[in-house]
Each structure stands twice: as C-alpha cells, then as structure tokens.
From Swiss-Prot:
Source species, domain of life: Bacteria
Pathway of action: Glycan metabolism; osmoregulated periplasmic glucan (OPG) biosynthesis
Keywords of this entry: Cell inner membrane, Cell membrane, Glycosyltransferase, Membrane, Transferase, Transmembrane, Transmembrane helix
HAMAP family hit by this protein: MdoH_OpgH (MF_01072)
UniProt protein name: Glucans biosynthesis glucosyltransferase H
Protein species of origin: Cronobacter sakazakii (strain ATCC BAA-894) (Enterobacter sakazakii)
Transmembrane segments: 140-160, 194-214, 513-533, 570-590, 615-635, 656-676, 680-700
Membrane topology: Multi-pass membrane protein
Family: Belongs to the glycosyltransferase 2 family. OpgH subfamily.
SUPFAM superfamilies given in the database record: Nucleotide-diphospho-sugar transferases
Amino acid sequence: MNKSTEYIDLLPLSDAEKAALPTSDMQALHQALDAEGRVWAREDDSPLGSVKTRLEQRWSDSLKGDQLIKDDEGRTQIQAMPKATRSSMFPDPWRTNPIGRFWDRLRGREVLPRYMAGLTKEERAAEQKWRTVGTIRRYILLLLTLSQTVVATWYMKTILPYQGWALINPADMMGQDWLVSLMQLLPYVLQSGILILFAILFCWVSAGFWTALMGFLQLLIGKDKYSISASTVGDEPINPEHRTALIMPICNEDVDRVFAGLRATWESVKATGQQAHFDVYILSDSYNPDICVAEQKAWMELIAEVQGEGQIFYRRRRRRVKRKSGNIDDFCRRWGNQYSYMVVLDADSVMTGDCLTGLVRLMEANPNAGIIQSSPKASGMDTLYARCQQFATRVYGPLFTAGLHFWQLGESHYWGHNAIIRVKPFIEHCALAPLPGEGSFAGSILSHDFVEAALMRRAGWGVWIAYDLPGSYEELPPNLLDELKRDRRWCHGNLMNFRLFLVKGMHPVHRAVFLTGVMSYLSAPLWFLFLALSTALQVVHALTEPQYFLQPRQLFPVWPQWRPELAIALFASTMVLLFLPKLLSVILIWCKGPKEYGGFLRVTLSLLLEVLFSVLLAPVRMLFHTVFVVSAFLGWEVVWNSPQRDDDSTPWSEAFMRHGSQLLLGLVWAVGMAWLDLRFLFWLAPIVFSLILSPFVSVISSRATVGLRTKRWKLFLIPEEYSPPQVLVDTDRYLVLNRSRSLDDGFMHAVFHPSFNALATAMATARHRASHVLEIARDRHVEQALNDTPEKLNRDRRLVLLSDPVTMARMHYRVWAHPERYSSWVNHYETLKLNPQALSTL
C-alpha cells in the first residue's frame, strides 16, 4: 500500500486538489485536510482533525443544516438527534396476587378499577354509550360461543363408542384385579380426555367463527356507527401544536429495505403538504458492526435525497435494554415530551401520507383515544408461501379485523406497529416492569404490544382499530421456517403475558386478550394431545376385548356403539365453522367486484388452492407450536433473531433437518393406523400425509420462481399487485436503487476508507472527556485489535471500537501510516471489494 498517494486517491477531489495535498506522511496529510489547523497531542489522533473536511467532501448534500458540531473535547460530531428534553417514565410493579387485591378491597383501598377511576364524570358519561354496547355485544359472543360448544360437546359424547359412564363405580373395582380394573377404566379415561379437549378446541374455533361472521356482516352492510374512522371527514386542518414522531425501531435488519420503505413513506407524507407536522426517528438496536456502518451511510443518503435535515434523525443505542420496548421507552424519556403523538413503524412497514395524516386527525377528533391501530395489508413478496399468505390475510383478514372491532370497540388490540399512540399517557402509564420471579416466564416482557394496550386502557384511554383506514402496509416472512422462527418468540411472549391475567385494574377485555394470546399457541399441543388420545382409543378398541359388564350382577352388556350419522353431522358442522369464514370472504369479494383479485374464476381457484395449502401446513404448525410451548415451559432459550425480510428459498438440507422428525412421525403414524384399522387412517389422512410431505412443501413453497409463476397466472392476486399504490411502487424502486449501492463489510471500510471512517468517527456516541485511565483502555483496545487478525476480532470488540471516535481515528491512522506492521489487516482489506456504486451516487 503506497500510503499517502493511495489515501489521496480515495478522496472525492479533483486532480488539482489532490496534487496540492502533501504526500510525505499521514500526519501532514491530515493536518492539511484540517481546516481549523488544530495540532493534536498524539500523532495518531490527527485524523480527528480531518473528519469535518472528509465529511463535507463526500456528504455535503446531507450536511446543509447545523448537523456538524463539536463535542466537549473539540472533536467533530454529527448531531444525528435533536437535543433531549427528559421525562420520567417509571413502571408500576405488577400485582398478580388476587388474594392481596381482595384484601385491599375489604379495607376500602380500591373503590373503582383503575381504568374507571382515572376518568372524570363527564368523560365517563361521554364513553358510557359505546362501552355499554361493547359489553352487551361481548355477552352475546360469550353466549353464542358457549351454547354452540355445549351442543357440539353433547353430540361428541353421544358418538363416542363406550357409553357405560354411569355404570362405573370405583368402589366395586377395589376388590378385583388391578389389570381388569385398568382395562375397564382405560377407554373411559381416554374418552373423558378427548371430550374435554374437544370442548376447549371447539370453543376456540367457535369464537373465531362468530368474529368472522360479524365482520362479514359489518363489511357487507358498509355502515358502522361506532367506527372511529367515521369521526372525521379527512380534510380537517392539523393543529400545528400537536406534532407527530414517526419512530422506527430496528435491529440488524435489511438496511436497503428499511430505508427504501422509509423514503417512500416520507415522500408520501411530503406529497400531502403536511410534513411540517412530522419528524422521523430511526432507532437502531443493531449489534452487527457491518450493519451499523451501513445504516449510517443509508441515513446520510436518505437525508440528501429527500432534503430531510432537521426532520429525519438516527440513533444507535449502545446498551440494548429491554429490546424493542426499551428502545421505544428510551425515545419517550428523551424526546417524547416534544410530541403529542408517535406512530410506531416496523422495519418492513410502509404507510401512505394520507393514512398517517388520517391517524393524526382521528387522534385529534377523539381526545380519549390512547392508541389507534391501523389494519396493515401484507404485500411485496414473491415466494409461493408468501404470496399464498398475502392472499389469505388480504382476503380473510378484513373480516376478522372488522369482527374484532365489532366485539371490542374501544377496548381493542395493539399490534406493535403501524399504529398511532398518544405520547403523554403512554409515558405515564405504559412503562413495563419486569415480571417478578425466576425462570423462563420472568424478567423483561417479550411481547410488549398487548401489554401496553392493556395498560393504556387501564388508565382510562381508548384503544381502537381503524379497520377501514387504507394505506397501511407490511411484509410477511418469505417461507414457512422463517415464519416459525417468528412464531417461536411470539409464543414465548404470549405465554409470559398470561402471568398478567390477574393483574390489578386490567379491563376484562384485555384479560381475554391475554387468554386468546395464550390459546393461539396452546391450542397446538391441545390439538396434538386430542389426536394422540384419539389414536390411543383406537388402539385400545382394536387390540383389547371390550368390557361388556362393568358392575357385579349386571343383567345386560354395554355394547360399544358407532353412530356414523352423528359423527358425519358433527364433522360437517366443525368444517363449516372452520371454512365458512373463508367462503364468506370470497362472497364479499364477489359482491364488491373480484377484478382486483384476478376475476371470479381465479379468485375462486385461489381460494381452493389456499384451503389445500392451509390443510397441508396446519399439522406442521401444530407440531412446531407444540415444541415451542414445551420448550418455553422447560426454560429453553429463545433467540430473538430478526426475521428474514426478503424473498429467500429454503435449502433441502435445512428442510429435512427441520421437518425430518415430522416426516418420520407421519410415516410411523400412517403405517401403524393402516395395520390397526384402515378406516381410521382415512380420518387421519390429512394429518399424517401433511407431515410426510412437510419438507417437500416447505422447500417448494419457499421458491420465488414458483410464486412468480402463479403471479403471471393471476393466482393469489391481491389489489396491491393488480394496481400497486404509489408508495409501494416507490418502495420497490428505491429498494432496487439501494441494492445497487449497498455496503458490505462496513466495519472494515470504516477502519480503512477515508469517507466511511469520517462518518463512523463523527457518528460514534462514546463522547468522553479526557481521562488517563480511558486513554490506557483505548490504547489497549486498539493494540489488541490490530495485533490480531481481523477474523479474530469478535462482534463485541468491534462494537466497542465503533462506539468511540478516538479508537476509530487511531485505528484508521495506524493501518495507513504503518501498513507493514499491520499487514494482516491490510491484506484482508485488499481482498474486500467496495461496491463502486456505494459512493458514486453521493
């Protein structure tokens, strides 16, 4: 490496400007680049003086404002965040002991639940109408669900083969051989377990059915007097005193996709002319050093391209406390009191300006609303699996979302993103204390969104779903295994949340939300246990002689019975509950026009294919979710990796590794049932053959080529593909642009490349004052890093270096000034290729 000359060649200067720079040594070069002419005490600190010049040479369009400042030691720093104005945000400890709460009530310490006590009489009167309606509706839902379950369970009891329940007397069995007693009791024990599990699972299915049915009626009629979207006409002026922060917490995400969606969203906001009411905060918890540098570069490009200086901010936390919820809490403590509202965006979120301004207007029209959740539509993926899921959520999702709103009204869900939140009550009431105790269900809350909604409602604020507000989008995982990775952490989080079921002051609706969150995953092991007991009952029936006489001196035998007409009727009614919501969804599309879904025939064929696909995947999800639930109870660690946000196919090796046990179970199950009773295999066929085919379905459905073929055939077509909204078109266009100029190996470029080193140095957040002890630590970090090979420098050590401007400057200086001493670093860097487009567009 010809140090000075090669260094100068990397600077974005004209030939004349390059020729004017000294080439004698690196210290002189950095002093020449230092416009202020400061003399640094240490030779290897000289790059600190040239940071400002190197930044302005490369990123002049991004630095038009007052972003460049000096820290207390005179080092150049990019002011990536506004000045903090701190607020206190402390969580209340959880009180989950119902006995203690009952004792407080006896002593008169708790007169009203907290969600009522926080309201004035006028506010109570204003909300009493919809609250009463919601309560009546939920009692009706409970009555419908329970009555339907009772009837179905009675039918189930009558079709079970062993009907001698009333004749079993444990006292009569005490004097007989234990094996005889076991043979008498075993079928009835199995049947009792089957009946209990059937009742629970049928009740769960019934609740979903009535939710979808009411959503269908709501959407078919088209009028909802309690819809929060009806509270504005959509063109009211926004109060300039009520500003909104768009916050996007990210962690090791696809940088190109994140900033493409964010740019499209911001440009859509600008198109409304209301951008003065909004600021954007990118809140990074990334701990991959290469991604951290890529985020900094992408932020600088975004500011330059949308003229976002002073309105688009970036921050990377060095201490990742409480993950996403802690990141949001940290924002609220430092900058929350500067805003009336905040909209939480996920890394894959895209929202139109009309949707965002509409959410703000809804907040202003409903001063008692604490959270308003939009209904994001899934789009943007090309694998067969993702397109099938997009179609399902786009077709069936509106029914269930409208149905949830019908039953819950202002005591509804919050899904953690694409929602607007009133900041002041969120700060005052929604801080999350860790769950007490030890074990896998203690500590920081993992799934924070449902809990924050419950706390907001407990404090007296409404939580609404604006199910009919368009312009909110998200992406789904591209394949089954990536979806299951996400499900694993959601499963653990929902199981943790159930510990809050008895917490003081929670609204009954949100207690039910915690219960349904648990059942979303607990239903899988219950279903598996139901199938296992049914199989065991069939084994007992096939291999043992029935016990016809269950009591001494019994005159008539108890014959095992089979009533196929009732079994078929019960099976048919269960299938109606499961599949009628899908049919109602398509009927709704037929009524309102199926053109955007490919036309009448294609949307119908897509429905049938999606039903087949869901039948194939349901047993696979059942087994995975069963493992997730068991692992959570056993305390196995849950790894919070960011889900794959891009189209990605599953390799055959991974598919057989993940699904191999399911394939084996399906084969053993099928062969065993075929040997025992071929007729029973007919009933189990959808289960066992789905398990046998699971690795093949997983791989084939993960391929974008198959998905794009169905797209050409207009199968699984959704309106966002038929007529893409501008914000999604822009997202795709900016994603292609970002891909063409993406930065790989960001940390190494931050050490070597003049421009990226200047950016990393100016963005470093460890701005300490002069300290002899700190200097010793810095030298130790730099020496240890450079004396090892780059491959041996682990992630945590790289992050320590990247967070300190002095260590980044010293490493930069040393590898250029003494390449022979640090040849392992120089040789490694020379093997890396910097994307030529990564800097050419700036």
